[in-house]
Amino acid sequence: MEIIKDIVSLIASILIFLGSIIALISAIGIVKFQDVFLRSHASTKSSTLSVLLTVVGVLIYFIVNSGFFSVRLLLSLVFINLTSPVGMHLISRAAYRNGAYMYRKDDASRQSTILLSQKEFNTPEELKKRAKLREERREKLYYKEKEYINKMDD
């Protein structure tokens, strides 16, 4: 019985360690990626997985060694896995609508800093101009789609 307890504790430790490694990779991605959208992708996907692995490892460890099942850990796991992607989606959507800089592959050879592209200026006026242009395009597509749906209904 003691051997099984040790094996399950080892599995829990491995899960916690993997969660820590994935959190480290997430932190590196946040620092290395070029724009808001890539950074949000790195932070959301991998941090959600790292929290999942870490909390499951802790839950298993406490169940085996203490015989203690924590509803708080389970609720925190559910809460984080539901709210983290939704929150980051809202942040990314707000950044997109405000005209935040988007990294492009052709910027890679000419890019001098992480935040700015040499092709375009990221002054507040330019950002507002791009956001307005995106909104106009979105409205045109929305109305075309609405007309198409109305035509199909008739």
UniProtKB/Swiss-Prot annotation:
What the entry lists under Pfam families is as follows: PhaG_MnhG_YufB
Cell location: Cell membrane
Superkingdom of the source? Bacteria
Give the UniProt entry's GO cellular component terms: plasma membrane
Keyword Disulfide bond listed? The answer is no
User: Which InterPro entries does UniProt cross-reference here?
Assistant: PhaG_MnhG_YufB (IPR005133)
How is the protein disposed in the membrane? Answer: Multi-pass membrane protein
Question: Does this entry carry the keyword Cell wall biogenesis/degradation?
Answer: no
Mention one GO molecular function: sodium:proton antiporter activity
Give the transmembrane region(s): 11-31, 51-71, 72-92
Q: What keywords does the record list, in alphabetical order? A: Antiport, Cell membrane, Ion transport, Membrane, Transmembrane, Transmembrane helix, Transport
* Family, as annotated: Belongs to the CPA3 antiporters (TC 2.A.63) subunit G family.
Q: How does it assemble?
A: May form a heterooligomeric complex that consists of seven subunits: mnhA2, mnhB2, mnhC2, mnhD2, mnhE2, mnhF2 and mnhG2.
- The name this protein goes by in its record: Putative antiporter subunit mnhG2
Native organism is: Staphylococcus epidermidis (strain ATCC 35984 / DSM 28319 / BCRC 17069 / CCUG 31568 / BM 3577 / RP62A)
Q: What is the lineage of its organism?
A: Bacteria, Bacillati, Bacillota, Bacilli, Bacillales
Which gene is transcribed and translated to give this protein? mnhG2
